[in-house]
Amino acid sequence: EVHNFACLGKPDPGGCAHYIYRRYYYV
């Protein structure tokens, strides 16, 4: 998902990272 990649590229993927991980785990 582009959104996920965008979050990872951010300088502070703390909250984003959590969301991505949760999404991945859920999937």
From Swiss-Prot:
Keywords: Protease inhibitor, Secreted, Serine protease inhibitor. GO terms for cellular component: extracellular region. It comes from the Eukaryota. One of its GO terms (molecular function) is serine-type endopeptidase inhibitor activity. It is found in: Secreted. Residues 1-27 form the BPTI/Kunitz inhibitor domain. Signal peptide: none annotated. Inhibits bovine trypsin and human neutrophil elastase. This is Kunitz-type serine protease inhibitor 3. It comes from Rhipicephalus microplus.
